[in-house]
């Protein structure tokens, strides 16, 4: 897995290309505050990886094992720690910078964005699982109900994993193949085309696309 970074979704806007006459909706992601927490190697840990920490946090809000781990490697208390693993033979980036940011990406690059979707609360099966519902004809009183949920006398219970009403949303989702429209290192923000999972202020992970290579590798 190539190196990625953690960011905060600030919201959406649009970018207009004067030459092409195209308006592109983009999501603005703030990537300031990333810090290398630990570099793992095959000799010391059995595999190559790097841990990236994000978001300053009060010490009393971080549990002691995590706080001790971060302090051991020279990082302060952080909200999120994410590990990016590198395969054997994969090129590893330079970790001397200490604070990775928007410069890891470039205009025109394809990325995958991982986030947590918006919560919808307690919902029925029509909204939660896209059930078609019951007939809407005259006299019917169960328009949006799921219908039968059990088999009968045997097994005398509802099967596990039966699709039923419940809490909907707050799922971990990955949106693949989003194009980096603009990289602004001076502001430490990245503008990616389209929407990314989650609400404003939600945390996301940005990493190079698995299905589409970076511009240099594509040539």
What is each residue range found by the language model?
Residues 1-219:
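Extended basic (Lys/Arg/His-rich) segments that typically form rRNA-contacting surfaces
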